[in-house]
From Swiss-Prot:
Protein name as it appears in the record: Probable chemoreceptor glutamine deamidase CheD
Gene Ontology process terms (BP): chemotaxis
Gene3D superfamilies: 3.30.1330.200
SUPFAM superfamilies, sorted: CNF1/YfiH-like putative cysteine hydrolases
Organism taxonomic ancestry: Bacteria, Bacillati, Bacillota, Clostridia, Eubacteriales
Amino acid sequence: MSDRRLEAVGLGELKVADRPDQVLVCYGLGSCVGLALYDPVVRIGAMVHVVLPDSSMGRGREAPPGKYADTGVEAAVAALVDAGASRSRLIAKAAGGARMLRLAGSNPQLDIGARNTEAVRAALARHQIRLVAEDMGGTYGRTLQLFIETGRVLVSTVGRGEHEL
């Protein structure tokens, strides 16, 4: 693993990678959703760290394209196609969307994790991209990794170990 280059994808960020040694990582996903998109033929991938479900929540303020599910998926698909990926070959895997606050159970509008999860699924459906695997929901945080060389996606959780999506 020492020859791999870990690249953190921070809150609201979107990163595209095309080198075999690159590993894109979203650390500490709580209510946020980490979305990995990958073209297995040309081995190009992207990761988006979605913070909120919809860009209308920004009220006209400038925000990074990955902050919202709708703009994040749109920007990631465009960036991947620009880098040489084929929209029709893109596959998606996602993790996160947890309910991190107990208050969320009383008002669905406050359950940002569930809203992020649904918004990511809807944005992918609009772009006709298959969500082939996910680890979303629950009440615990996760870390998501995308290995560009293989397209392998790992989810790590404190106390629950690591598994492949």
